From Swiss-Prot:
Its EC number is 2.3.2.26. It is found in: Secreted; Host cell. This is E3 ubiquitin-protein ligase SopA. Keywords: Secreted, Transferase, Ubl conjugation, Ubl conjugation pathway, Virulence. GO terms for molecular function: ubiquitin-protein transferase activity. GO terms for cellular component: extracellular region; host cell. One of its GO terms (biological process) is protein ubiquitination.
Length: 782
C-alpha cells in the first residue's frame, strides 16, 4: 500500500507536530532503513533521544504543547499517550512511503485488541480541512481514546475510515446532550469529544424537559466543561441551569429564555446574546468573559471579566440599533430616544430593576473607568436626542439613582448634565412628599435615593424648614434604615444639626424636653424626642416626637397612639386634650392626615350613633356625638335638665326594663354584620361599644367630675349586660363584671366614675380582643 505524504495538509497541524514529522524525514532521507519504534511522552526535549544508524531505533520525546494538543482528560491518561509508527522505509523515491498490507493488518488488529475492551470505539486523528492520516498512524490513550482539535466524531472499530454522522435535528442534539450530561452526573469522566457540542442546534429546546430536575434546583447539578461554540440556542429555554467552564464562542442565544441561568468560568466571547423578554430573573455571569458579545440593556454583569476593547466593528443586528462599548462588551442602544425607548432603557424603577443604567453600574468598582466611559457615551446619546424636560421627567428618579453617585460624579460631562435633572427631581419630591408619607424605603431607596435627597438638602438648606415634613422623613429613614451606610447616617446627623440651629427651629429645643434634654439629639435610642416638625401654617407652632412615634404615625397600625407627642407654641408645651387630631393634622401637620383618615375609616363606632340619633330627627345631637369622637376631651356637657330629659326620651325606648330591646339588639347586629356571627364575637363587639358609651358618660366627654348623663350610663351598662348573657367567658371574672355593673349604677357604695370604668374595660379589650376594639373605638380615644 502506497501513501503519499503529500496527502497530509501539514499547514493545519500544530507547529510541534510539523517538527516531529520533519525530523523523521531528515533521519530517513539518506537511505537509512530505520525502524521508528515509538514516540513517547517523556520530560526530555524533542531532540534529546535521537539515535541514527542503519538498523537503530529512533525515539522522540513529546513536548508539552503536543501533549496539550491531544487533550487528555487527566495526568494518568497523558502519561499513557502513545504514537506508534512501524515499518516506515524511505525508498528515496520522491518522498513515497511504503507500508505493507500485512503490517497494516497487524497494526489494526493490535489496536483493536488494545482498545475494544475499554471503550468499544476508536477515534481516528483528523485535522480540520485535511484528509485522514495514513492507516496505522493513530493517536490514542491506553484507557480511552482522545480527539484532537479537529473534533472528529467516533468511527466504528474496523478498517474503514468512514465517520458517524452528526445529529440532524435539535431533538437529536438534545438527546445526545442528555446522554452526555447523565454520564457525567453518574461520575464518568467524559472525553473532550464527549463534551464537544460545537455547531450544535438546540433551537426551541426547553432544557427542563430533557434534563433531570436536579439540574434546575438551586445548588443542583452542573453542566461542566462542555463546548457549545458556534451553536444555536434561538428560542430555547435554559432557565435555572448552571454552566461551568463551558465555551459558547460565536454561539447565537437569540430570544433565549435564561431566567436565573448561571454562567461561571466560561468563555462567551463573540456571542449574540439577546435573551427573551419572558426572562423573569436575570442570568448571572461569574468569572466569565464576554469579549465583543452583544448584551441587552437589562443584563447583570456583576461577575464579568472585562478587558480593553479591540478594534472590532459593532455587531450587525437585523432590527438595527446603536451600540456603546463597556470595556470589550457591546451594549445595545435605541436608534431614537422615543417615549418607549426612554422607559425601556432608562426606567429601572418601572422595569423590575432593569435598565442600561443598572447594567453598566452592575460591574464591580475595579472597572470604574470603563463604567464612567460607557455612561459618558450614554449621556452624549441622551444629549444628542434633544429630550425635553417632560420627556425625562418619568425617569428622573432612575437617572439620579445612578448618575448622582460616584464614580460618575467625578465626570465633568456627566455632572453637568445630571445637575438640572437632580434639581427637578428634588423639587418634585418636595412638592409630593412634604404633606404625605414617603413610601416605605427598601434597600434600593435607602442606598440610591436617600443620599441624593441629602445632597439636595445640603445644596438647598432653605428647604429644610420650608419642607420640614419631607426633611424630617428623610432624616428619619437615614437614621433607621438598616441598609443605609454609616456615611449616609453621618451626613444625615450633620444636616440635622444645621436644621436645629435655624432661627425657626432653635426656640423649640431648649425646653428640657428635646433629645438628650440639653437641646441636642440623642441618636442612641429611638425613645428620645429627637424630631421636630414645623407647622405648615404657623411658624410659632411645632411638634416634637420620638423616632418610634414618628415611624408609627407615618405607617400606623390599629394600635397606633395619635397623641404621643409634644405640641409646642413658642417653645412651650401646650395641652392637646381639647384639640381634634384630625384638625391639627389638616391645618398644621398634613404629613399625618392621610394615614390618620385611613385608620379612622376603619373605626365603625359612628354606625351605632346613626342608628340611635338619626340625622333627620336628631341632627344637632348627632353632630355633637360625632364631633366628640374626634377629641380626647369635650367642652360640651349634657348634664343640664333639658339635655338629660332629651337623652332619656331617646334612649328609654331602647332600654325597656334596663335591657336592650330585641328590635334594637337586632339593629346593632345588622349594622355590624353580626347576625350570623358566634355569640362570642357578638359579645366582644357589644363589650367594645359599651366602653365607648362609658367614655361618653365620663367627665372627659359629656359628663363632669360630679355628674354624668344617666341615659348614657344606663345604655353602656345594658350593652355590657347583653355581652355577659352571650358570652361570660370574655370577661375577666364574674366579680369584675359585677364591679363594673355596680359602678355604672352607683350600687353597693361603688365608686361611680365612669372614666375609670371606661379605662378598665378598654384595657381588658385591648389585651384579649384588640382587633375588635380597634374596629370600633374612635382614634382620638384609643
Amino acid at each position: 500500500m502506497k501513501i503519499s505524504s503529500g496527502a497530509i495538509n501539514f499547514s493545519t497541524i500544530p507547529n510541534q507536530v510539523k517538527k516531529l514529522i520533519t525530523s523523521i524525514r531528515e533521519h530517513t532521507k539518506n537511505g537509512f532503513a530505520s525502524k521508528i519504534t515509538s514516540v513517547k511522552n517523556t520530560h526530555a526535549s524533542l531532540n534529546e533521544k535521537i539515535k541514527t544508524g542503519k538498523s537503530s531505533s529512533i525515539e522522540f520525546a513529546l513536548p508539552q504543547k503536543i501533549k496539550d494538543f491531544f487533550q487528555p482528560k487527566d495526568k494518568n491518561t497523558l502519561n499513557k499517550t502513545l504514537i506508534t509508527v512501524k515499518n516506515i522505509k524511505d525508498t528515496n523515491n520522491a518522498g513515497k512511503i511504503n507500508i505493507s498490507a500485512e503490517d497494516v493488518s497487524k497494526m489494526n488488529a493490535a489496536f483493536m485488541r488494545k482498545h475494544i475492551a475499554n471503550q468499544s470505539r476508536d477515534y481516528n486523528y483528523r485535522v480540520t480541512g485535511a484528509a485522514p492520516l495514513p492507516g496505522g498512524v493513530s493517536v490514542s490513550a491506553n484507557n480511552r481514546p482522545t480527539v484532537s482539535e479537529g473534533r472528529t466524531p467516533p468511527v466504528s472499530p474496523s478498517l474503514s475510515l468512514q465517520a458517524t454522522s452528526f445529529p440532524s435535528s435539535p431533538a437529536d442534539w438534545a438527546k445526545k446532550l442528555t446522554d452526555a450530561v447523565l454520564r457525567q452526573k453518574a461520575g464518568e469522566t467524559l472525553t473532550a469529544a464527549d463534551r464537544d457540542f460545537s455547531n450544535a442546534d438546540f433551537r426551541n429546546i426547553t432544557f427542563s424537559k430533557i434534563l433531570p430536575p436536579s439540574f434546575m434546583e438551586r445548588d443542583g447539578d452542573i453542566i461542566k466543561g462542555f463546548n457549545f461554540s458556534n451553536s444555536k440556542f434561538t428560542y430555547s429555554d435554559i432557565s435555572h441551569l448552571h454552566f461551568d467552564e463551558c465555551r459558547f464562542t460565536y454561539s447565537t442565544l437569540s430570544d433565549v429564555v435564561c431566567s436565573n441561568t448561571k454562567f461561571s468560568n466560561s468563555d462567551m466571547n463573540e456571542v449574540f446574546l439577546q435573551y427573551s423578554i419572558t426572562t423573569q430573573q436575570q442570568p448571572s455571569f461569574i468569572d466569565t468573559t464576554l469579549k465583543n458579545t452583544l448584551i441587552r440593556h437589562k443584563a447583570n454583569l456583576s461577575g464579568v471579566i472585562l478587558h480593553e476593547p479591540d478594534n472590532s466593528s459593532p455587531p450587525s443586528v437585523s432590527r438595527g440599533g446603536n451600540f456603546i462599548r463597556l470595556g470589550d462588551i457591546w451594549l445595545q442602544m435605541p436608534l431614537l430616544w422615543t417615549e418607549n425607548a426612554v422607559d425601556g432603557f432608562l426606567n429601572h424603577e418601572h422595569n423590575n430593576g432593569k435598565s442600561i443604567l443598572m447594567t453598566i453600574d452592575s460591574l464591580p468598582d475595579k472597572y470604574s473607568q470603563e463604567k464612567v466611559r460607557a455612561m459618558e457615551d450614554l449621556v452624549k446619546s441622551l444629549r444628542g436626542g434633544r429630550l425635553t424636560e417632560a420627556g425625562i421627567r418619568p425617569v428622573e428618579s432612575s437617572l439620579v439613582s445612578v448618575l448622582a453617585h460616584p464614580p460618575y460624579t467625578q465626570s465633568a460631562l456627566i455632572s453637568e448634565w445630571i445637575r438640572p435633572v437632580q434639581e427637578r427631581f428634588f423639587a418634585h419630591q418636595c412638592q409630593t412628599y412634604n404633606d404625605v408619607p414617603l413610601p416605605a424605603p427598601d434597600t434600593y431607596y435607602q442606598q440610591r435615593i436617600l443620599p441624593v435627597l441629602l445632597d439636595s438638602f445640603d445644596r438647598n438648606s432653605a428647604a429644610m424648614t420650608t419642607h420640614s415634613g419631607l426633611f424630617n422623613q428623610v432624616i428619619l429613614h437615614c437614621m433607621t434604615g438598616v441598609d443605609c451606610t454609616d456615611g449616609t447616617r453621618q451626613k444625615a446627623a450633620a444636616l440635622y444639626e444645621q436644621y436645629l440651629a435655624h432661627p425657626a427651629v432653635s426656640p423649640h429645643i431648649h425646653n428640657g424636653l428635646f433629645g438628650n434634654y440639653d437641646g441636642s439629639p440623642d441618636w442612641t435610642t429611638r425613645a428620645a424626642d429627637n424630631f421636630l416638625l414645623l407647622s405648615s401654617q404657623d411658624s410659632d407652632t411645632a411638634m416634637m416626637l420620638s423616632t418610634n412615634t414618628l415611624l408609627t404615625m407615618l405607617n400606623p397600625t390599629p394600635d397606633t397612639a395619635w397623641d404621643n407627642f409634644y405640641l409646642l407654641r413658642a417653645g412651650e408645651n401646650v395641652s392637646t386634650a381639647q384639640i381634634s387630631p384630625v384638625e391639627l393634622f389638616r391645618h398644621d401637620f398634613p404629613v399625618f392626615l392621610a394615614a390618620f383618615n385611613q385608620q379612622a375609616t376603619q373605626r365603625r363606632f359612628g354606625e351605632l350613633i346613626d342608628i340611635i340619633l338619626s340625622t333627620e330627627e336628631h341632627g344637632e345631637l348627632n353632630q355633637q356625638f360625632i364631633a366628640a369622637t374626634n377629641q380626647k376631651h369635650s367642652t360640651v356637657k349634657l348634664i343640664d335638665d333639658a339635655s338629660v330629659s332629651r337623652l332619656n326620651t331617646i334612649f328609654d325606648p331602647l332600654l325597656p326594663e334596663g335591657k336592650l330591646s330585641p328590635a334594637h339588639y337586632q339593629h346593632i347586629l345588622s349594622a355590624y354584620h353580626l347576625t350570623d356571627a358566634t355569640p362570642q364575637k357578638q359579645a366582644e363587639t357589644l363589650f367594645c361599644l359599651s366602653t365607648a358609651f362609658a367614655r361618653y358618660s365620663s367627665s372627659a366627654i359629656f359628663g363632669t367630675e360630679h355628674d354624668s348623663p344617666p341615659a348614657l350610663r344606663g345604655y353602656a351598662e345594658a350593652l355590657m349586660q347583653k355581652a355577659w348573657e352571650l358570652s361570660p367567658a370574655i370577661f375577666p371574672s364574674s366579680e369584675q363584671f359585677t364591679d363594673w355593673s355596680d359602678r355604672f349604677h352607683g350600687l353597693h357604695g361603688a365608686f361611680t366614675c365612669t372614666s375609670v370604668v371606661a379605662d378598665s374595660m378598654q384595657r381588658h379589650a385591648r389585651k384579649y380582643f384588640p382587633s375588635v376594639l380597634s374596629s370600633i373605638l374612635p382614634l382620638a380615644w384609643a
